[in-house]
Amino acid sequence: GEIVNIHASENVGYYHQAHSYVRGPWRNSVESSPMILAKCCHDMDILRYLIGEKCVSVNSYGSLSYFRKENAPEGSTQFCSDCPRSEECIYNAQKLYTRYIWPAGYFTKGELAEQNILRDLKYSPYDRCVYRCDNDVVDHQSTVLLFEKGKTAVHTMTAFSGEIYRDIKIYGTKAEIVGVMEDNFLEVRPLGGKAYRVDVNSEASVGGHCGGDYYMMLQIWNAMNGRPCEGITYLDVSLESHLMAFCAEKSRLSGGSTQFVRLREGE
Protein backbone atom coordinates (compact mmCIF):
# COMPACT_ATOMS: atom_id res chain seq x y z
CA GLY A 1 0.00 0.00 0.00
CA GLU A 2 0.83 3.70 0.09
CA ILE A 3 2.00 5.60 3.16
CA VAL A 4 -0.55 8.24 4.18
CA ASN A 5 0.91 9.62 7.39
CA ILE A 6 3.52 8.89 10.06
CA HIS A 7 3.77 9.49 13.80
CA ALA A 8 7.33 9.38 15.15
CA SER A 9 8.86 10.16 18.55
CA GLU A 10 12.37 10.96 19.71
CA ASN A 11 12.39 10.03 23.38
CA VAL A 12 15.56 11.74 24.54
CA GLY A 13 15.72 10.25 28.04
CA TYR A 14 15.71 12.39 31.19
CA TYR A 15 19.39 11.71 31.96
CA HIS A 16 20.53 12.33 28.37
CA GLN A 17 18.62 15.62 28.35
CA ALA A 18 20.25 16.66 31.62
CA HIS A 19 23.72 15.77 30.37
CA SER A 20 23.67 17.05 26.79
CA TYR A 21 20.96 19.71 26.64
CA VAL A 22 20.91 21.23 30.13
CA ARG A 23 24.45 20.93 31.50
CA GLY A 24 26.39 19.98 28.40
CA PRO A 25 27.60 21.10 24.96
CA TRP A 26 24.20 21.50 23.26
CA ARG A 27 22.38 23.34 26.06
CA ASN A 28 22.55 26.79 24.47
CA SER A 29 21.26 27.50 20.97
CA VAL A 30 23.62 30.46 20.46
CA GLU A 31 26.71 28.41 21.32
CA SER A 32 25.59 25.26 19.46
CA SER A 33 22.27 24.95 17.60
CA PRO A 34 18.53 24.56 18.19
CA MET A 35 17.81 21.18 19.76
CA ILE A 36 15.53 20.12 16.89
CA LEU A 37 18.54 20.43 14.58
CA ALA A 38 21.12 18.87 16.91
CA LYS A 39 18.95 15.91 17.93
CA CYS A 40 16.43 15.41 15.15
CA CYS A 41 17.80 16.41 11.73
CA HIS A 42 18.31 12.69 11.04
CA ASP A 43 14.72 11.99 12.13
CA MET A 44 13.63 14.54 9.53
CA ASP A 45 15.83 12.73 7.02
CA ILE A 46 14.18 9.38 7.84
CA LEU A 47 10.67 10.84 7.49
CA ARG A 48 11.62 12.40 4.14
CA TYR A 49 13.07 9.05 3.00
CA LEU A 50 10.06 6.99 4.08
CA ILE A 51 7.47 9.28 2.50
CA GLY A 52 9.58 9.79 -0.61
CA GLU A 53 8.39 13.32 -1.32
CA LYS A 54 9.70 16.80 -0.69
CA CYS A 55 8.56 18.47 2.51
CA VAL A 56 6.78 21.70 1.60
CA SER A 57 5.78 23.22 4.94
CA VAL A 58 6.31 22.89 8.68
CA ASN A 59 4.46 23.94 11.84
CA SER A 60 6.12 23.42 15.21
CA TYR A 61 5.42 24.07 18.89
CA GLY A 62 7.54 23.59 22.00
CA SER A 63 9.39 25.30 24.82
CA LEU A 64 11.78 25.04 27.71
CA SER A 65 9.10 24.31 30.28
CA TYR A 66 10.82 22.51 33.16
CA PHE A 67 14.58 23.02 33.46
CA ARG A 68 14.22 26.57 34.78
CA LYS A 69 15.26 28.35 37.96
CA GLU A 70 11.68 28.74 39.20
CA ASN A 71 11.36 24.93 39.33
CA ALA A 72 14.41 24.43 41.56
CA PRO A 73 13.52 22.71 44.86
CA GLU A 74 13.49 25.00 47.88
CA GLY A 75 16.88 24.96 49.58
CA SER A 76 18.75 23.56 46.57
CA THR A 77 22.16 24.95 45.62
CA GLN A 78 24.20 25.66 42.50
CA PHE A 79 26.08 22.33 42.57
CA CYS A 80 24.82 18.83 43.31
CA SER A 81 27.98 18.06 45.33
CA ASP A 82 26.87 20.21 48.26
CA CYS A 83 23.11 20.30 47.72
CA PRO A 84 20.97 19.26 50.72
CA ARG A 85 18.21 18.15 48.32
CA SER A 86 20.44 15.97 46.11
CA GLU A 87 19.41 12.61 47.53
CA GLU A 88 15.78 13.11 46.55
CA CYS A 89 16.54 14.60 43.11
CA ILE A 90 16.43 12.34 40.04
CA TYR A 91 18.90 14.69 38.31
CA ASN A 92 21.54 14.32 41.04
CA ALA A 93 24.78 14.42 39.03
CA GLN A 94 26.62 11.96 41.28
CA LYS A 95 23.87 9.38 40.82
CA LEU A 96 23.47 9.90 37.08
CA TYR A 97 27.15 9.80 36.12
CA THR A 98 27.90 6.69 38.16
CA ARG A 99 24.82 4.90 36.83
CA TYR A 100 25.09 5.96 33.18
CA ILE A 101 28.83 5.83 32.58
CA TRP A 102 29.21 6.97 28.97
CA PRO A 103 28.41 10.68 29.56
CA ALA A 104 31.13 10.84 32.22
CA GLY A 105 33.68 10.61 29.41
CA TYR A 106 33.02 14.29 28.71
CA PHE A 107 34.81 15.39 31.88
CA THR A 108 36.63 12.43 33.46
CA LYS A 109 40.40 12.22 33.12
CA GLY A 110 41.67 8.66 32.81
CA GLU A 111 39.68 5.48 33.31
CA LEU A 112 35.93 5.80 33.81
CA ALA A 113 36.10 4.38 37.32
CA GLU A 114 33.69 5.67 39.96
CA GLN A 115 36.36 7.41 42.05
CA ASN A 116 37.68 9.24 38.96
CA ILE A 117 34.20 10.25 37.86
CA LEU A 118 33.28 11.68 41.28
CA ARG A 119 36.65 13.44 41.59
CA ASP A 120 36.40 15.25 38.26
CA LEU A 121 32.66 15.85 38.48
CA LYS A 122 32.78 17.96 41.65
CA TYR A 123 32.09 21.63 40.90
CA SER A 124 32.44 21.05 37.16
CA PRO A 125 29.77 22.30 34.70
CA TYR A 126 28.28 18.79 34.82
CA ASP A 127 27.78 19.10 38.59
CA ARG A 128 25.45 22.08 38.15
CA CYS A 129 21.84 22.01 39.28
CA VAL A 130 19.68 21.35 36.22
CA TYR A 131 17.40 24.19 37.28
CA ARG A 132 20.25 26.72 37.49
CA CYS A 133 22.12 26.35 34.18
CA ASP A 134 22.48 28.71 31.21
CA ASN A 135 20.42 26.42 28.97
CA ASP A 136 17.86 27.82 26.56
CA VAL A 137 17.02 24.90 24.25
CA VAL A 138 13.62 23.21 24.46
CA ASP A 139 12.74 20.21 26.58
CA HIS A 140 9.84 19.23 24.30
CA GLN A 141 8.82 20.04 20.74
CA SER A 142 6.14 18.73 18.38
CA THR A 143 6.35 19.29 14.63
CA VAL A 144 3.80 18.75 11.84
CA LEU A 145 5.26 18.23 8.36
CA LEU A 146 3.33 18.51 5.09
CA PHE A 147 4.73 16.82 1.98
CA GLU A 148 4.14 17.80 -1.64
CA LYS A 149 1.36 15.30 -2.42
CA GLY A 150 -0.55 15.87 0.81
CA LYS A 151 1.03 13.21 3.02
CA THR A 152 1.78 14.26 6.59
CA ALA A 153 4.06 13.37 9.47
CA VAL A 154 4.02 14.35 13.14
CA HIS A 155 7.28 14.25 15.06
CA THR A 156 7.56 14.67 18.84
CA MET A 157 10.80 15.19 20.72
CA THR A 158 10.65 15.01 24.51
CA ALA A 159 13.07 14.99 27.43
CA PHE A 160 10.60 13.24 29.69
CA SER A 161 11.16 9.55 29.01
CA GLY A 162 12.75 7.00 31.29
CA GLU A 163 15.07 5.67 28.59
CA ILE A 164 16.51 6.74 25.24
CA TYR A 165 14.54 5.35 22.30
CA ARG A 166 12.75 6.19 19.09
CA ASP A 167 9.36 4.84 18.11
CA ILE A 168 7.40 5.11 14.90
CA LYS A 169 3.92 4.31 13.62
CA ILE A 170 3.36 4.34 9.87
CA TYR A 171 -0.23 4.47 8.61
CA GLY A 172 -0.72 3.08 5.12
CA THR A 173 -3.63 2.34 2.83
CA LYS A 174 -3.33 -1.40 3.50
CA ALA A 175 -1.55 -1.71 6.86
CA GLU A 176 -0.01 -0.07 9.90
CA ILE A 177 3.66 -0.58 10.77
CA VAL A 178 4.76 -0.06 14.37
CA GLY A 179 8.27 -0.16 15.73
CA VAL A 180 10.66 0.83 18.49
CA MET A 181 14.17 1.18 17.11
CA GLU A 182 15.92 -0.46 20.05
CA ASP A 183 13.65 -3.55 19.90
CA ASN A 184 15.05 -4.67 16.52
CA PHE A 185 11.69 -5.69 15.08
CA LEU A 186 8.67 -4.17 13.36
CA GLU A 187 5.05 -5.21 13.77
CA VAL A 188 2.99 -5.12 10.59
CA ARG A 189 -0.77 -4.87 11.13
CA PRO A 190 -2.67 -5.45 7.86
CA LEU A 191 -6.05 -3.74 7.76
CA GLY A 192 -8.58 -6.49 8.35
CA GLY A 193 -5.81 -9.08 8.70
CA LYS A 194 -3.56 -10.68 11.29
CA ALA A 195 -0.54 -8.83 12.64
CA TYR A 196 2.91 -10.32 12.15
CA ARG A 197 6.43 -9.48 13.20
CA VAL A 198 9.44 -8.68 11.02
CA ASP A 199 12.80 -9.09 12.73
CA VAL A 200 15.51 -6.56 11.92
CA ASN A 201 19.16 -7.55 11.68
CA SER A 202 20.59 -7.15 15.19
CA GLU A 203 23.91 -5.93 13.78
CA ALA A 204 22.21 -2.58 13.27
CA SER A 205 22.22 -2.05 17.04
CA VAL A 206 26.00 -2.35 17.42
CA GLY A 207 28.09 0.77 18.04
CA GLY A 208 27.36 4.47 18.36
CA HIS A 209 23.89 5.64 17.29
CA CYS A 210 22.74 2.01 16.90
CA GLY A 211 25.32 1.32 14.20
CA GLY A 212 24.81 4.63 12.40
CA ASP A 213 28.32 5.93 13.12
CA TYR A 214 30.01 2.79 11.81
CA TYR A 215 27.91 2.43 8.67
CA MET A 216 28.17 6.11 7.78
CA MET A 217 31.98 5.92 7.89
CA LEU A 218 31.89 2.62 5.97
CA GLN A 219 29.84 4.21 3.18
CA ILE A 220 32.26 7.15 2.98
CA TRP A 221 35.21 4.74 2.82
CA ASN A 222 33.46 2.73 0.08
CA ALA A 223 32.77 5.90 -1.93
CA MET A 224 36.38 7.06 -1.66
CA ASN A 225 37.65 3.67 -2.78
CA GLY A 226 35.32 3.13 -5.74
CA ARG A 227 33.15 0.54 -4.02
CA PRO A 228 29.32 0.38 -4.00
CA CYS A 229 27.87 2.81 -1.46
CA GLU A 230 24.10 2.41 -1.29
CA GLY A 231 23.70 4.76 1.67
CA ILE A 232 25.11 7.87 -0.01
CA THR A 233 22.51 10.53 -0.85
CA TYR A 234 22.76 13.60 -3.04
CA LEU A 235 23.50 16.86 -1.26
CA ASP A 236 20.13 18.47 -2.02
CA VAL A 237 18.30 15.61 -0.28
CA SER A 238 20.68 15.67 2.69
CA LEU A 239 20.30 19.43 3.06
CA GLU A 240 16.51 19.16 3.00
CA SER A 241 16.39 17.45 6.40
CA HIS A 242 18.43 20.28 7.92
CA LEU A 243 16.13 22.86 6.31
CA MET A 244 13.13 21.04 7.76
CA ALA A 245 14.71 21.32 11.22
CA PHE A 246 15.57 25.01 10.77
CA CYS A 247 12.01 25.69 9.59
CA ALA A 248 10.63 23.83 12.61
CA GLU A 249 12.64 26.04 14.94
CA LYS A 250 11.62 29.21 13.09
CA SER A 251 7.99 28.12 13.36
CA ARG A 252 8.33 27.37 17.07
CA LEU A 253 9.89 30.76 17.78
CA SER A 254 7.06 32.48 15.92
CA GLY A 255 4.27 30.67 17.78
CA GLY A 256 3.76 27.80 15.35
CA SER A 257 3.42 29.80 12.15
CA THR A 258 3.66 27.94 8.84
CA GLN A 259 7.17 27.87 7.42
CA PHE A 260 7.77 26.85 3.81
CA VAL A 261 10.73 24.59 3.06
CA ARG A 262 12.64 25.99 0.10
CA LEU A 263 16.06 24.75 -0.92
CA ARG A 264 16.47 27.61 -3.38
CA GLU A 265 14.91 31.04 -3.75
CA GLY A 266 11.82 30.93 -5.95
CA GLU A 267 10.83 27.34 -5.16
Model regions and ranges:
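A generic fold-level signal
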Residues: 39, 135-138
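C-terminal helical cap and adjacent loop that interface with cofactors, partners, or active-site loops
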Residues: 137-267
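Eukaryote-specific, low-hydrophobicity, charge-rich regions
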Residues: 125-135, 149
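Predominantly a Rossmann-like dinucleotide-binding segment in NAD(P)-dependent oxidoreductases
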Residues: 1-128, 255
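Conserved short-loop catalytic and cofactor-binding motifs
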Residues: 35, 131, 204-208
